[in-house]
Regions:
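Short, acidic, metal-binding catalytic loop of nucleotide-sugar glycosyltransferases
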Residues: 67-77, 336-339
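A conserved acidic beta->alpha catalytic loop
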Residues: 84-93
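Conserved donor NDP-sugar-binding/catalytic core segment of glycosyltransferases
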Residues: 142-181
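A recurrent flexible, glycine/aromatic-enriched loop bordering the glycosyltransferase active site
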Residues: 185, 193-218, 232
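Donor nucleotide-sugar recognition loop
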Residues: 207-213, 222-259
Length: 518
């Protein structure tokens, strides 16, 4: 497209050499978006637009981050969009001197927030703000590594339905963390170079991601950029949910590592931060009808481990998730199988809570069924599955054994079902645990203690695995605090009440695996 000429209030856009997109008769949302985006592109457009915003911290964050970027991204065609968001330490001057020809610099005179910095730079642009096929958001507390961007682009270009990818890192939660055990910057880069080997088996589908650094399709970014209601965190969660509900895959590239220094915000008031997190969580729940934490971070690591302890992994596996909330346990089973070379899976979900239907439907090719638990077999019919995972504690159902029997009836030959049980219903809260230890609550009628005998009599191979991994950190904190209390140190009775044995009895959970004989 040629130059744009302004004549009073008229803008002339020369499109003589452009051709309209040809969509043919294929009804494919993803292909059509790619074709439409290609029409407005220019021959000299870069492959990637890297957006980098900084507010002070020139020496300790910005310089190292950009030095690493220039060194380890030399093989990628990219433009660099630099935004100085009100810095007073020479950041703007450093941007001007940065030895990279394909850069654009925006200077914001006063910092009034990261959202404003991005929007102001975008609005000030004559023409397209993001000119690359892919958008990369690179914070100044990230040190990139060898092959970081190449690996993520390989992932993106493997499937046009992948809309948003993020690498592994340190100083991050959400099971995106990896410890390379390095001693300094040079050692980190050496170990990252060995780690960063593209491997499709390590591309994990997720419901949400924390974008330490992210790659997003530019047309998708323009379709949904951000919801500015999320001023109290959770903007990242919002982006993940928005893109996935549009039908796109959200992928964690666990074959790629970048170093995350941590927040550049100093002097954070922890109480205020916690309050803001809760505000953002409430806003997210109001928008999406689900909780960004409890409904999404149920990775069920131990259930998956118990399931495959003695169960053969199968290609073309049919997997059913029952009451798995938004569906993380289902995706994690798919990821586990993919990591072990089983690339084809079909996911199906059954939920007793309709608010989860939309998120489950975004990735369950086998369909989503919704109804009371006693309608399970009626809804599913005669379908069978290689793996069944049940996401809620079994004592939440009125008749535990009836539910297990009904679900297990849908196992294929050699298939396996995994569910979780407990003996006590105690929240994961230090104060609640302390109160329960002082006055032990009654065992759950539908808990493991009351059901174990009948479970073992079911016509399946039944194995029961006790575990405490989900409360391990909680236990460590609980007893670390107790050891600081003088009465605990000096009083044998108090130590007996708050003993590790009683804690374990209260908080132990059980993975129950049923295998149908071939």
């Amino acid at each position: 497209m040629g130059m744009r000429f302004l004549q009073d209030d008229v803008t002339v856009i020369h499109s003589d050499e452009k051709e309209a997109a040809v969509y043919a008769d294929i009804l494919d949302l993803y292909t059509n978006r790619e074709k439409s985006a290609a029409v407005v592109s220019e021959p000299n457009d870069p492959l990637v637009s890297i957006y980098f915003q900084a507010y002070n911290h020139l020496e300790d964050y910005t310089k190292p981050a950009l030095d690493a970027l220039l060194r380890y991204t030399a093989d990628i065609d990219y433009e660099l969009i630099l935004v100085d968001n009100g810095s007073t330490d020479g950041t703007f001057e450093y941007f001007q001197l940065l030895p990279y020809p394909r850069k654009r610099i925006y200077r914001i005179t006063k910092n009034i927030g990261a959202f404003f910095g991005y929007r102001a730079a975008k609005n000030a642009t004559q023409g397209r703000f993001l000119r690359g096929k892919y958008f990369v958001g690179l914070p100044n507390d990230i040190l990139v590594t060898k092959n970081w961007l190449q690996n993520m682009l390989i992932c993106m270009e493997s499937d046009e339905r992948i809309g948003f990818v993020v690498p592994m890192s340190d100083n991050v939660s959400n099971l995106q963390y990896v410890d390379l055990g390095y001693s300094d910057f040079g050692d980190m880069q050496e170990k990252a170079a060995l780690f960063n080997v593209s491997d499709p088996r390590k591309w994990y589908d997720r419901l949400r991601l924390i974008p330490t650094v992210c790659v997003i399709r530019t047309y998708l970014r323009e379709l949904y950029e951000a919801d500015y209601a999320f001023v109290y965190d959770f903007a990242d969660d919002d982006i993940s949910f928005a893109y996935r509900r549009l039908g796109y895959r959200i992928v964690l590239c666990s074959d790629t590592f970048v170093h995350h220094e941590g927040s550049t915000i100093v002097g954070v008031n922890q109480q205020e931060h916690s309050e803001n997190l809760e505000k953002g969580r409430i806003l997210f729940r109001r928008k999406y009808g689900v909780d960004a934490w409890s409904d999404v971070v149920n990775f069920e690591v131990y259930l998956r481990r118990a399931l495959f302890e003695r169960t053969q992994m199968r290609e073309n596996a049919r997997i059913l998730g029952i009451d798995v909330r938004c569906g993380t346990p289902l995706l994690e089973l798919r990821n586990t199988l993919r990591e072990n070379g089983m690339n084809q899976t079909v996911l199906t979900a059954y939920t007793t809570e309709p608010q989860y239907w939309q998120d489950l439907a975004s990735f369950c090719e086998g369909g989503v069924y919704c109804g009371d638990i006693d309608r399970l077999s009626c809804k599913i019919g005669d379908k069978t599955y290689d793996y069944i995972i049940m996401g809620t504690y079994m004592d939440c159902y009125e008749d535990v054994l009836a539910v297990i029997r009904a679900a297990a009836a849908h196992l294929s030959d050699g298939g396996a079902l995994v569910c979780k049980m407990r003996n006590y219903d105690v929240p994961y809260d230090l104060q609640e645990i302390a109160l329960a230890l002082q006055n032990m609550p009654p065992r759950l009628v539908q808990g493991m203690y009351g059901c174990e005998t009948e479970l073992l009599q079911l016509p399946y191979e039944v194995e029961i695995y006790p575990y405490m991994e989900e409360v391990y950190d909680l236990k460590e904190r609980f007893f670390a605090q107790l050891r600081e209390v003088e009465a605990y140190q000096n009083d044998a009775h108090i130590r007996a009440v708050f003993s590790e044995e009683r804690f374990d009895a209260l908080m132990t959970q059980y993975a129950v695996v049923l295998r149908k004989r071939s």
